[in-house]
């Protein structure tokens, strides 16, 4: 704590987890007690801690963090970063598609998510129809139904590519998180076109294997993605 003057703590959507509220409560204690710790480290300057609800989850949590680091490298002040982050969070669009609807539905209902009904899970499994779920400002909503998981994944890739080509991204990056080996994701239809589009438009494609928490919540083999642009979702 004595090495830094300003800390941003960014959490998963408060509508999906109590982590945000707990972090806010913990921050009160930190801000009350930091003086002695900093003085022991030879630092007598003030310390600030900002807990931020990203209003999103999975790959969409990465964009605010990525942009925070970018703004820091650009030398922006903490106040400017804080103000910008509010806009980034409000413009952040996440997309989720999973191969196992029953699993995602059952896990989601435990956290208050009703975006996939029992009937949708039954019909989707029987007909191999996968919903594309949109996460934005703390809400999750199905926005498309596609036959086959790889085709649903392609719709996600195509949506990112469409928004990259259209311009106007608030953050010059798009993010992907996959619940498996990344080589599997790279082999899916639409991925190569997305990667090429990002290169052509100088937009960074940030990708990672999904963490254990994500896999537990939406299932092995799930794909999540995000882009940041003001306005409604622009779906391919």
Question: Model-derived features: where do they sit?
Answer:
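N-terminal glycine-rich phosphate/adenylate-binding segment common to multiple enzyme folds
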Residues: 1-30, 34
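Short beta-strand->loop
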Residues: 11-13, 52-55
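Mixed-charge interfacial surface used for oligomerization/domain docking
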Residues: 19, 25-28, 38-40, 46-50, ...
């Amino acid at each position: 704590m004595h090495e830094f003057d300003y800390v941003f703590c960014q959490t998963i959507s408060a509508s999906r987890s109590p982590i945000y509220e707990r972090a806010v409560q913990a921050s009160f204690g930190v801000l009350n007690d930091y003086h002695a710790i900093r003085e022991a480290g030879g630092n007598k300057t003030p310390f600030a801690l900002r807990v931020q609800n990203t209003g999103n989850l999975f790959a969409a949590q990465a964009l605010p963090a990525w942009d925070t680091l970018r703004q820091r490298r650009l030398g922006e002040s903490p106040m400017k970063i804080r103000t910008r982050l509010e806009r980034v969070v409000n413009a952040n669009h996440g997309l989720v598609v999973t191969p196992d609807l029953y699993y995602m539905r059952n896990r989601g209902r435990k956290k208050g998510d009703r975006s996939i009904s029992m009937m949708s899970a039954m019909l989707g499994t029987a007909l191999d129809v996968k919903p594309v779920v949109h996460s934005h400002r703390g809400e999750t909503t199905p926005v498309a139904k596609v036959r086959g998981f790889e085709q649903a994944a392609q719709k996600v890739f195509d949506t990112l590519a469409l928004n990259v080509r259209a311009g106007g991204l608030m953050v010059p990056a798009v993010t992907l998180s996959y619940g498996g080996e990344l080589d599997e994701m790279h082999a899916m239809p639409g991925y190569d076109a997305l990667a090429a589009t990002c290169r052509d438009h100088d937009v960074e494609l940030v990708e990672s294997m999904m963490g254990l928490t994500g896999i537990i919540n939406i299932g092995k083999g799930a794909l999540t993605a995000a882009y940041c642009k003001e306005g409604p979702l622009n779906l391919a």
